[in-house]
């Protein structure tokens, strides 16, 4: 079946292996992941657009090995997606209603974009009847088997919710009373999007989540924990300004605004554009785009957060001041640890000899 659709079995299994690892499953699950993907056309997906830039859809379209055309449309049965579907106007609205009715209680709903709510619903209307985005979201959510908010706009409101939030843009979770899994990012990795669908196919349940309803398998660790420049941070080697010698040598970007220590995501592990790169690799710090209200709380993007948001363990010193000392402190702690280990080893040997 794969060969008929122009997909090499080796490429497909390579993709399945990568998805298995990404979901933190043992390698023995790879054949099961592959089988789930092959059977995934039984799981209809409806994708709605709200107030957004379509960046999350752009990310999805860059899924690789197999690509979006062969994997998503052939195996996951994408029933409705305004960016890639041919229908428009009345026909598009008919297709949506048909999918909701035909797959009632069985489809996965994915929503991209913040949603003007309350008395401001009219700021976003969709389709030939001028239905508000909030009405569309509530209607499609009612009979969904699982609901995913794709991107930070749908998860937390997005940049259109920035103060003073003139359109009262809200996350999907505040528009529907159904459980919502948030997949934030601006945009999220295509593998974080597809991985959640595969998790649902494999286990028939939603993934475990953190306090902000983000899947733990994707958002369980900080950018800082997985960053390839973490060693530079620990050594106290920082870029002082863009273009300086430290920037050329790949030093830590914390002092020029990187929000990696405060941001939970797996960008450094998965990267973007078919695993090509990610912001820190390209020379710019993380802006914290998978965190709630990052548009208001993480700026200015080229300056450290310091002590404005987060208390530290350093007697009130801002994180930017701490960065000056952290390298020396950690190196000293490491030296103490090495010495302690040596003493302990000698004691154990003496005990064994006696």
From Swiss-Prot:
Superkingdom field: Bacteria
Pfam families, sorted: NiFe_hyd_SSU_C, Oxidored_q6
Molecular function, one GO term: 3 iron, 4 sulfur cluster binding
Post-translational modification: Predicted to be exported by the Tat system. The position of the signal peptide cleavage has been experimentally proven.
Locations listed in the record: Cell membrane
GO biological process: anaerobic respiration
Cofactor: [4Fe-4S] cluster; [3Fe-4S] cluster
Enzyme Commission no: 1.12.5.1
Gene Ontology cellular-component terms listed: [Ni-Fe] hydrogenase complex; ferredoxin hydrogenase complex; plasma membrane
Binding-site residues, [3Fe-4S] cluster: 267, 286, 289
Keywords: 3Fe-4S, 4Fe-4S, Cell membrane, Iron, Iron-sulfur, Membrane, Metal-binding, Oxidoreductase, Signal
Cleaved signal peptide residues: 1-36
Recorded catalytic activity of this chain's protein: H2 + a menaquinone = a menaquinol
Residues bound to [4Fe-4S] cluster 2: 224, 227, 252, 258
Keyword Lipid metabolism: no
Residues annotated to bind [4Fe-4S] cluster 1: 53, 56, 153, 186
Keyword Iron-sulfur listed: yes
Record's bilayer topology term: Peripheral membrane protein
Cofactor binding description: Binds 2 [4Fe-4S] clusters. Binds 1 [3Fe-4S] cluster.
Quaternary organization: Heterodimer of a large and a small subunit.
Family under the similarity heading: Belongs to the [NiFe]/[NiFeSe] hydrogenase small subunit family.
Database matches in NCBIfam families: hydA
Protein name, UniProt field: Quinone-reactive Ni/Fe-hydrogenase small chain
Organism annotation: Wolinella succinogenes (strain ATCC 29543 / DSM 1740 / CCUG 13145 / JCM 31913 / LMG 7466 / NCTC 11488 / FDC 602W) (Vibrio succinogenes)
Taxon lineage: Bacteria, Pseudomonadati, Campylobacterota, Epsilonproteobacteria, Campylobacterales
Gene designation: hydA
């Amino acid at each position: 079946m794969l060969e008929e659709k122009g997909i090499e079995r080796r490429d497909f299994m390579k993709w399945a292996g990568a998805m298995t690892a990404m979901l933190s499953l043992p390698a023995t699950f790879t054949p099961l992941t592959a089988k789930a993907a092959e059977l995934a056309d039984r799981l209809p997906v409806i994708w709605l657009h709200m107030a957004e830039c379509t960046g999350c859809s752009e990310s999805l379209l860059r899924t690789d090995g197999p690509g979006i055309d062969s994997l998503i449309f052939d195996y996951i049965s994408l029933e409705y997606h305004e960016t890639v579907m041919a229908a428009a106007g009345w026909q598009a609205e008919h297709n949506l209603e048909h999918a909701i009715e035909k797959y009632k209680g069985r489809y996965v709903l994915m929503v991209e974009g913040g949603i003007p709510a309350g008395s401001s619903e009219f700021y976003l209307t969709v389709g030939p009847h001028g239905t508000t985005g909030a009405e569309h979201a509530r209607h499609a959510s009612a009979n969904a088997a699982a609901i995913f908010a794709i991107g930070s706009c749908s998860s937390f409101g997005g940049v259109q919710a920035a103060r003073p939030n003139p359109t009262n843009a809200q996350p999907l979770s505040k528009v529907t009373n159904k459980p919502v899994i948030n997949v934030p990012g601006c945009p999220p990795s295509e593998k974080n999007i597809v991985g959640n669908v595969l998790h649902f196919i494999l286990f028939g349940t939603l993934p475990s989540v953190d306090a902000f309803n983000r899947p733990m398998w994707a958002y369980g660790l900080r950018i800082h924990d997985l960053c390839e420049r973490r060693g530079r941070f620990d050594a106290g080697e920082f870029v002082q300004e863009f273009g300086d010698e430290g920037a050329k040598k790949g030093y830590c970007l914390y002092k020029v605004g990187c929000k990696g220590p405060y941001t939970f995501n797996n960008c450094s592990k998965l990267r973007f554009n078919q695993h090509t790169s990610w912001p820190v690799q390209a020379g710019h710090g993380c802006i914290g785009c998978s965190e709630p209200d990052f548009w208001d709380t993480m700026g200015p993007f080229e300056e450290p957060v310091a002590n404005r948001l987060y208390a530290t363990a350093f007697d009130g010193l801002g994180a930017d001041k701490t960065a000056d000392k952290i390298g020396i402190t950690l190196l000293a702690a490491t030296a103490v640890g090495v010495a302690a280990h040596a003493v302990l080893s000698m004691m154990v040997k003496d005990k064994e000899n006696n």
